[in-house]
């Protein structure tokens, strides 16, 4: 039998300069640049995964500009997306609080065919920097209160938790595509991506 292809559109949103473009580059090309370049409107990348012996996953990554003036266009950008990543900078409390605005904007404009919200991960980026402007307890509570699938800390620079977090998101999309009602049911928990409980993300 031939390989079965799954195509998913994944949004990457959040305030400007939180690391969205760097995340997309790291995940799709395994590269990182120290030089900041502002996204204008939207940028795109493709990631292909051999999910199993018989299944191929193709991810269209939509890197949405974080500037306020572009938010009127988000309905167009969000259309037909299967999942979302919302990012903030752990050293910048404003980007954290604005994650709620991004989540509300997303939920008001995009749902799954079932009417449920699309899976959405909250990524606490730049975790290699200090001091953090928010605590893990604050993030955990915020994630649960705002209906995120889960959250974890990431460092695009150090390539920490990037592939692991995206794998969790792909698993959620694959489960949704199979209409598996017994699939991942986590709502907002910290997702433990590592063997040690202190450095990952809780799910399930």
Curated annotation (Swiss-Prot):
It is a lipid-anchor. It holds the Pfam family Ras. Belongs to the small GTPase superfamily. Rab family. It comes from Mus musculus. Transmembrane segments: none annotated. The modification Phosphoserine is found at residue 72. One of its GO terms (molecular function) is GTP binding. CDD domains: Rab32_Rab38 (cd04107). A lipid is attached at residues 203-204 (S-geranylgeranyl cysteine). GTP binds at residues 33-37, 39, 126, 156-157. Coiled coil: none annotated. The modification Phosphothreonine is found at residue 71. GO terms for cellular component: cytoplasm; cytoskeleton; cytosol; Golgi apparatus; Golgi membrane; perinuclear region of cytoplasm; plasma membrane; trans-Golgi network. SUPFAM superfamilies: P-loop containing nucleoside triphosphate hydrolases (SSF52540). Interacts with LRRK2 (via the N-terminus); this interaction is direct and stimulates kinase activity. Its main location: membrane. The keyword rRNA-binding does not apply. NCBIfam families: small_GTP. The small GTPases Rab are key regulators in vesicle trafficking. Essential for maintaining the integrity of endosome-trans-Golgi network structure. Together with LRRK2, plays a role in the retrograde trafficking pathway for recycling proteins, such as mannose 6 phosphate receptor (M6PR), between lysosomes and the Golgi apparatus in a retromer-dependent manner. Recruits LRRK2 to the Golgi apparatus and stimulates LRRK2 kinase activity. Stimulates phosphorylation of RAB10 'Thr-73' by LRRK2. Also regulates neuronal process morphology in the intact central nervous system (CNS). This is Ras-related protein Rab-7L1.
